[in-house]
Amino acid sequence: MTKLNDKAPSLATTLAHLLRQEPELLSFDSARLANALWQRMADEKILTPRLSTPTNTQTYPYTEIVKAAAYLSHQSGLPGLAMTWLAQQRLIEIIAQCENSVIKDTYLADLIAGNTLSALAVSEPKVGAHPKHLNTRADKVGDTYRLNGEKTYVTNGLNAAFFIVFAITDVVDKRKQFTAFIVPKDSKGLSISPLHGFDALKPSTHCTLLLDDCELPDSHILGDIGKAFDDISKPFREYEDVMMLAPLAGAMQSLIDQLCAHDAELIANDNLGQLLAITESVEVLSSQAASQLEQANPHTNPISLIITGRLLVEHFNQTIKQLSAEQPLNDAIKRLIKDIEVLSNIAQSVNKIKQINLAIHYRQQELT
């Protein structure tokens, strides 16, 4: 991993200083999120590093954020922790940038202070997050909306104070129009259940939501009616695709460290050199992709960097699987191997589509 330079203060060095001074912040029950860590990061003004507030005018570029996320994942050995930090940053920005004063007045202060979390609820059972197949509806009844449907794989759902739920509010020319609703966890008609069979990426939690005539006033609408997919979901997915390379890079380095500490002879030098090279390459690709995301320039699309990074992680996983087969590994190492595999598989089908689109674009250019 990139060495941190205390003489050149950055987001990563500020985070490193905090964790060195208060190492207990990474010693928490893995079944729940590290609330104390979020609150202390908020105190140090690094919980939302891109969000300028009256008390915090210092903001950081995406390249600084991915470096800090890789460091957090490396030091904790918990890519789910860094994943949660990155996701919350973007969700908090969405709340902060919305024009709905009721939503901002109700939730923003606690989010920025690290006192609470939010959760994005888009995916549905058996169909994933593809808008064509989503079915959760929000029907207008008088001055309220009545939500019915089911959501799954809701990240941090068991720890969230509220959910950003996508629901169909109209169909125009056979295209479903989605609106985002703020649904408090104690809403009548909302049932929250742990996602059974999913045991990875702790301390993040995952759950399912059942909405059964869940009524909400129109003051709970986040953003424009019918535009949630284009305005919230697509930009969030682009952000997530780029930023999640960093927790992977940090976790991969943590796994190498733990395997070598567990058994110095487990990995031969040629294989170790390969794993280290892959990890460093993923970190570099993460930084380059983040830099392109910062530019928001259509001519500097980070898709190729993301695809390459994920292919490298896939090769890393295959090598680790071969090296660790039938080896007596401890629970922490087994958990980390699983976490890296699960995190790298998120949006794998979307990544495959991007590869195909690159090929199609190339062939079309060849014909012109």
Predicted regions and their residues:
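A short core secondary-structure module
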Residues: E150-L190
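N-terminal glycine-rich flavin-associated loop
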Residues: P79-V102
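A short, Trp-centered hydrophobic/proline-enriched beta-strand micro-motif
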Residues: L47-P49, A113-S123, F166
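C-terminal hydrophobic structural anchor segments
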Residues: E283-L329
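Glycine-rich beta->alpha junctions and the first turn(s) of the following alpha-helix
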Residues: P194-V284
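A structural signal for short hydrophobic beta-strand segments in well-ordered beta-sheet cores
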Residues: T136-D139
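Glycine-rich phosphate/cofactor-binding loops in nucleotide/flavin-utilizing enzymes
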Residues: N317-T368
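Amphipathic, small/basic residue-rich leader segments at the start of a protein or domain
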Residues: M1-W85, D263, L293-P298, I360-T368
